[in-house]
């Protein structure tokens, strides 16, 4: 069922086709529109820009017209800048962000979702099987591992808003909290990393009136851990209590 929803029929070519593609996804119930301005680490097409300006703007404008947020997968610098100019709400991965681009993002209010924990998935697969990837893909993965965290070290001090994300599917489900450790390792104070996963993530997704902070009238989404995450953020990997929308899921 999902294959038909994410298959080649959802490719778009040209601005008008991109508008149609967005409307099609919204008609299917999409809350967020995500598209790629560059190739991916796991693809054989490289990380250069794969979209032109009018296509990106058409995607963003149409999504925003329907009140949807827009996330953009972008690794290469030109693709990141293209997404920011087009008005994207967030850049996912942003592996080559430099100071100029970070300043663009801060000025535009574009969030950065670093997805640092993707490297854990790569490292674990390679440890189990050094030949898990074709040579061309392995070279891109080695590069990605080597530059992990560098964009965050540039973007965060320059005032870019950081939101939490893991690129689920590359990172294993249930391993979300790995990202906290890496955000802190590469320069964010523990409280700011926690805010990235709560306050900032809710604001980015447009659900900050419902969740993201513990306030009267908002959803009771609460976790508890044995320890102080401000002293050791890794304790967030072992939750002792989970409440979602007021219902206890784990613990008592």
Q: What positions do the PLM features span?
A:
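Glycine-enriched alpha-helix->loop->beta-strand junction motifs that scaffold or abut catalytic
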Residues: 85-90, 106-111, 131-132, 159-161, ...
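Divalent-metal coordination cores built from histidine and acidic residues
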Residues: 1-68, 101-103, 108-134
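His/Asp/Glu-enriched, well-ordered alpha-helical/loop segment
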Residues: 65-69, 133-136, 142-229
């Amino acid at each position: 069922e999902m294959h038909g929803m994410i298959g080649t029929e959802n490719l778009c070519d040209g601005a008008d086709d991109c508008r149609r593609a967005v409307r099609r996804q919204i008609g299917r119930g999409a809350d967020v529109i995500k598209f790629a301005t560059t190739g991916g680490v796991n693809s054989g097409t490289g990380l250069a820009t794969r979209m032109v300006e009018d296509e990106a703007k058409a995607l963003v404008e149409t999504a925003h017209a329907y009140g949807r947020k827009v996330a953009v997968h972008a690794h290469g610098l030109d693709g990141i800048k293209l997404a920011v100019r087009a008005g994207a709400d967030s850049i996912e991965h942003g592996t080559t962000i430099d100071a100029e681009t970070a300043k663009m993002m801060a000025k535009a209010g574009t969030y950065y979702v670093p997805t640092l924990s993707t490297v854990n998935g790569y490292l674990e697969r390679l440890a189990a099987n050094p030949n898990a990837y074709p040579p061309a893909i392995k070279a891109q993965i080695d590069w990605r591992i080597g530059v992990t965290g560098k964009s965050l070290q540039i973007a965060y001090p320059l005032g870019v808003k950081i939101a939490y994300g893991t690129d689920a599917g590359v990172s294993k489900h249930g391993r979300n909290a790995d990202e906290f450790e890496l955000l802190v390792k590469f320069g964010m104070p523990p409280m700011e990393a926690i805010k990235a996963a709560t306050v900032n993530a809710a604001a980015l997704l447009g659900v900050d009136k419902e969740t993201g902070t513990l306030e009267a009238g908002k959803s009771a989404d609460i976790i508890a851990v044995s320890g102080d995450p401000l002293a050791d953020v890794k304790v967030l990997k072992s939750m002792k209590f989970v409440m979602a929308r007021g219902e206890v899921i784990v613990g008592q």
